[in-house]
């Protein structure tokens, strides 16, 4: 099992799906605090933001392939942290609305808890509490600072801590983790998410699926949201379907209108199927 030291006093090293990442954590704080960048001993350019440990990013040379996506971790102990669903996607595509819809669909039969990521606020967590998605004690809001993708990939401890705490506190069956809004290159580490959902919407036009990026090509499930807006923005859903199938090599995707409940049942079925396979449990 992949392990993380939540203390972060000094160097630690852990393996991610596409290579090793070395995080240099300086005791003297010389590279923390207000940010900045520098060249590390490994030759990579490192940077830091308020609230996050120094980190570097692996260069991305291609959008990736669905068939070559990182598999779920074999040695996961769900007694230590429940099956975790990662929900990523650009700002405004409907991640928080999906979190709310999933909570409403699953909370009667399953013990749930949720962690939200925002860059400088706790707005998404507060939204879930305000709308009664789950009891307040089952929700944690994390402020990631200016590099939201690091919190779901390079320096996941900021999310692992709350997820593990909630998992034990709530005896959770499922954990939901919403990333901060980011670009098409951002995707979850398998050390954090057992099942990865990436959500885009049609407001950017029908070109988005073919632009690719790890989220679109390698998420376990792609959601194309707000299909009701297609006529207004001139997006052709047939083109989006064709491109999604091609970019994802036939991997699953769902057309949805999450706010109106369209496609939510199909999304829930995908999640529960993965949960059953990973945990050996039967859906209720």
UniProtKB/Swiss-Prot annotation:
Composition skew (Basic and acidic residues), residue ranges: 15-29, 41-51
Function: Required for the maturation and activation of urease via the functional incorporation of the urease nickel metallocenter.
Pfam family, one: cobW
Record: residues binding GTP: 89-96
One MF term in the entry's GO annotations: GTP binding
Keywords assigned by UniProt, alphabetized: Chaperone, GTP-binding, Nickel insertion, Nucleotide-binding
UniProt keyword annotation of Acetylation present: no
GO terms, biological process: urea catabolic process
Subunit structure: URED, UREF and UREG may form a complex that acts as a GTP-hydrolysis-dependent molecular chaperone, activating the urease apoprotein.
Organism, as annotated: Oryza sativa subsp. japonica
Family (UniProt): Belongs to the SIMIBI class G3E GTPase family. UreG subfamily.
Presence of the UniProt keyword Phosphoprotein in the record: no
Name of the protein described by the UniProt record: Urease accessory protein G
Start and end residues of each stretch annotated as Disordered: 1-51
Classification via NCBIfam families: ureG (TIGR00101)
């Amino acid at each position: 099992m992949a392990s993380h030291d939540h203390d972060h006093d000094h160097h630690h090293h852990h393996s991610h799906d596409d290579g090793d990442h070395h995080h240099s954590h300086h005791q003297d704080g010389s590279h923390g605090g207000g940010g900045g960048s520098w060249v590390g001993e490994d030759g990579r350019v490192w940077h830091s933001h308020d609230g996050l440990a120094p980190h570097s990013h692996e260069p991305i040379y291609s959008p990736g392939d669905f068939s070559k996506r990182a598999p779920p971790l074999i040695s996961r102990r769900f007694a230590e942290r429940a099956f975790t669903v990662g929900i990523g996607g650009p700002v405004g595509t409907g991640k928080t609305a999906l979190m709310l819809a999933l909570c409403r669909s699953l909370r009667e039969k399953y013990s749930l808890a949720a962690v939200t990521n925002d860059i400088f606020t706790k707005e998404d967590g507060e939204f879930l509490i305000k709308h009664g998605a789950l009891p307040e004690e089952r929700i944690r809001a994390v402020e990631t600072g200016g590099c939201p993708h690091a919190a779901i990939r390079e320096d996941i401890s900021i999310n692992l801590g709350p997820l593990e705490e909630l998992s034990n506190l709530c005896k959770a069956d499922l954990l939901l983790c919403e990333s901060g809004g980011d670009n098409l290159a951002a995707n979850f580490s398998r050390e954090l998410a057992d099942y990865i959902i990436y959500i885009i919407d049609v407001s950017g036009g029908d070109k988005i699926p073919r632009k690719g990026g790890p989220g679109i090509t390698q998420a376990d499930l792609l959601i194309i949201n707000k299909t009701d807006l297609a006529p207004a923005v001139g997006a052709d859903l047939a083109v989006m379907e064709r491109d999604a199938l091609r970019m994802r090599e036939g991997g699953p995707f769902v057309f949805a209108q999450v706010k109106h409940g369209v496609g939510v049942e199909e999304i829930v079925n995908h999640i529960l199927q993965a949960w059953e396979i990973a945990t050996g449990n039967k859906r209720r």
